[in-house]
């Protein structure tokens, strides 16, 4: 019902009268978003889609007199397309175009506050999921992005032509700093490029951060001297405050570590962008862990798809980002994983619905982020990992290194031999999909460490249906 009062039409109007504009053609400067939307029973999808556009831009639940003080046509979000989700009842893809002026330059925090803010609690919606974002080049150019990127990292490490190898030190909690450093040393001297703090290692009573940093750096320097290779360990600088985080980063730089680590979701995008800018200024690589992501991205009809988080992290800044494995213990659909892996490291990615890429994305030469495959992987997975992720990736074996029956160093050697054998076989034109197991068995004949690993894990599989599929 509308009433005439104070010179404007007060009251409540359908959102679609203002925010549903199917004739609108998006501009190159618009930020585009695709939502998977489940309306409440009886609510038209166009009205729901318009509500999403309104509540994530300029709208509110009623007409307000201050609408007349601005140009709504210039600033409002516009739902320009609604289409049913194939194979799903009462689910729709809703495409919204947002004017560039709605977003602060260089702020991932501001973009997400608008797109995934109050609108996700809207009563007319049973569920809502942000599937993809197209960042316009004009906005991309306001972000620093990764501190260094894949090419610069390879130059700093002097490692080319193969994936990098890593390992998360286990047990994740409870080791003293000296024993932790010893485990790092054994893994690095055995053939790994990196070792890693687990995401929940910060500065607990059993191992304070400064002690860990010093013993780990000793392990790095000792293993480098023995192997004549550049080594590193992802020292987790995540802390309760940004000031403490930067203090730990400064200390890591002072002792000479090449790479540090941050938990970007629990730490927050503002803290992450701050740290990424510090890393570029100080020549330190930045490894990003995605702890908490499954709370946000695992449900198929509500939340945020990981491809959006990966895009946002690339803009916020990170040289590495965990991406799942497809073949390990953690959730990961192959087509969708390959889609967001490309969005992490390629400069230009074409729209491809078969891989979950809803928009063509031009990164305008922003450095790429290296995907990190980790979670329940071992030597038998090596051929599939090399084929799926290619050279510009980091393959991280935690239990698949430390669980070797002969210890950490032989476990690391087994992984390095398996990797080198798979890369050589691929370069010789052999199919890892068909001949991968044979490649590993052949290499195991002259590597007792690999042979022992192959025997130990020959029966281990993680065969569960993927929850989030395309």
From Swiss-Prot:
Q: What is the phylogenetic placement of the source species in the record? A: Bacteria, Bacillati, Cyanobacteriota, Cyanophyceae, Oscillatoriophycideae
Q: What is its main location?
A: other
**Catalysed transformations (reactions):** 2 (2R)-3-phosphoglycerate + 2 H(+) = D-ribulose 1,5-bisphosphate + CO2 + H2O; D-ribulose 1,5-bisphosphate + O2 = 2-phosphoglycolate + (2R)-3-phosphoglycerate + 2 H(+)
Q: Which UniProt keywords apply?
A: Bacterial microcompartment, Calvin cycle, Carbon dioxide fixation, Carboxysome, Disulfide bond, Lyase, Magnesium, Metal-binding, Monooxygenase, Oxidoreductase, Photorespiration, Photosynthesis
Identify the domain of life: Bacteria
Misc note = RuBisCO folding and assembly commences when the nascent large subunit folds with the help of the chaperonin GroEL-GroES. Requires homodimeric RuBisCO chaperone RbcX2 to assemble into RbcL8 octamers, making RbcL8-(RbcX2)8. The exposed C-terminus of RbcL binds in a cleft in RbcX2. RbcX2 is displaced by RbcS; as RbcX2 is removed RbcS mediates the ordering of an internal RbcL loop (Thr-63-Leu-69) in a catalytically active conformation. Interacts with accumulation factor Raf1; dimeric Raf1 acts after chaperonin GroEL-GroES, binding to RbcL(2) leading to an RbcL8-Raf1(8) complex. The basic functional RuBisCO is composed of a large chain homodimer in a 'head-to-tail' conformation. In form I RuBisCO this homodimer is arranged in a barrel-like tetramer with the small subunits forming a tetrameric 'cap' on each end of the 'barrel'.
Catalytic positions?
A: 170 (proton acceptor), 289 (proton acceptor)
Does Protein biosynthesis show up as a keyword for this record? Answer: no
The record's comment on protein family reads: Belongs to the RuBisCO large chain family. Type I subfamily.
Location of this chain's protein in the cell = Carboxysome
Q: Where is this site: Transition state stabilizer?
A: 329
Sites of N6-carboxylysine modification: 196
State the EC number(s).
4.1.1.39
Q: Which GO terms of the cellular component aspect does the record hold?
A: carboxysome
Q: Does the keyword Disulfide bond apply?
A: yes
Q: What does this protein do?
A: RuBisCO catalyzes two reactions: the carboxylation of D-ribulose 1,5-bisphosphate, the primary event in carbon dioxide fixation, as well as the oxidative fragmentation of the pentose substrate in the photorespiration process. Both reactions occur simultaneously and in competition at the same active site.
Tell me, what is an example of a GO biological process annotation in this record? reductive pentose-phosphate cycle
Kindly give the CDD domains that the UniProt entry links to this protein: RuBisCO_large_I
- Gene coding for it: cbbL
State the span of motif (Interacts with RbcX2): 459-465
Which residues are noted in the entry as substrate-binding?
Answer: 118, 168, 172, 290, 322, 374
One family from Pfam that matches here is RuBisCO_large
Native organism = Picosynechococcus sp. (strain ATCC 27264 / PCC 7002 / PR-6) (Agmenellum quadruplicatum)
Q: Please identify the protein, giving its name as recorded.
A: Ribulose bisphosphate carboxylase large chain
């Amino acid at each position: 019902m509308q009433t005439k009062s104070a010179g404007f039409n007060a009251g409540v109007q359908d959102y679609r009268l203002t925010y549903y504009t199917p004739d609108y053609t998006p501009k190159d400067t618009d930020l585009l978003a695709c939502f998977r939307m489940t309306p409440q029973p009886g609510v038209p999808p166009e009205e729901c889609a318009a509500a999403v556009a309104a509540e994530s831009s300029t709208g509110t639940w009623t007409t307000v007199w201050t609408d007349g003080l601005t140009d709504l046509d210039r600033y409002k979000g516009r739902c320009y397309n609604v289409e049913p989700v194939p194979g799903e009842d009462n689910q729709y893809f809703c495409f919204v175009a947002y004017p560039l002026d709605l977003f602060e330059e260089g702020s991932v925090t501001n973009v997400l506050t608008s797109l995934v803010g109050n609108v996700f609690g809207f009563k007319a919606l049973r569920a809502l999921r942000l599937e993809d974002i197209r960042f316009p080049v004009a906005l991309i150019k306001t972000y620093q992005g990764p501190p260094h990127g894949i090419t610069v990292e390879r130059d700093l490490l002097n490692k080319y032509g193969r994936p990098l190898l890593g390992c998360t030190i286990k047990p994740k909690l409870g080791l003293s700093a000296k024993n932790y450093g010893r485990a790092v040393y054994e893994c690095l001297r055995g053939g790994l490029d990196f070792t890693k703090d687990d995401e929940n290692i910060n500065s607990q009573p059993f191992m304070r951060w400064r002690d860990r940093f010093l013993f780990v750096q000793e392990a790095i320097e000792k293993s480098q001297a023995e192997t004549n290779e550049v080594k590193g360990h992802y020292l987790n600088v995540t802390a309760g405050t940004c000031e403490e985080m930067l203090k730990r980063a400064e200390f890591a730089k002072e002792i000479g570590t090449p790479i540090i680590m941050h938990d970007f979701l629990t730490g927050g995008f503002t803290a992450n962008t701050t740290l990424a800018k510090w890393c570029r200024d100080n020549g330190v690589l930045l490894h990003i862990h995605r702890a908490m992501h499954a709370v946000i991205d695992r449900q198929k009809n509500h939340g945020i798809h990981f491809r959006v988080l990966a895009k946002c992290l690339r803009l916020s800044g990170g040289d590495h980002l965990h991406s799942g494995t497809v073949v390990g213990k953690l959730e990961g659909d192959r087509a969708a994983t390959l889609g967001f892996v490309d969005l992490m490291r390629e400069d230009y990615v074409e729209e491809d619905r078969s891989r979950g890429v809803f928009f063509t994305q031009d990164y305008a030469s922003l450095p790429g982020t290296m995907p990190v495959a980790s979670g329940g992987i071992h030597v038998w997975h090596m051929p599939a990992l090399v084929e799926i992720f290619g050279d510009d990736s980091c393959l991280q074996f935690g239990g698949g290194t430390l669980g070797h029956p002969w210890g950490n160093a032989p476990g690391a050697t087994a992984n390095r031999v398996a990797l080198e054998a798979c890369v050589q076989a691929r370069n010789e034109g052999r199919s890892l999909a068909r001949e991968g197991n044979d490649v590993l068995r052949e290499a195991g004949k002259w590597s007792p460490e690999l042979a022992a690993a192959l025997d130990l894990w020959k029966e281990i599989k993680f065969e569960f249906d993927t929850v989030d599929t395309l």
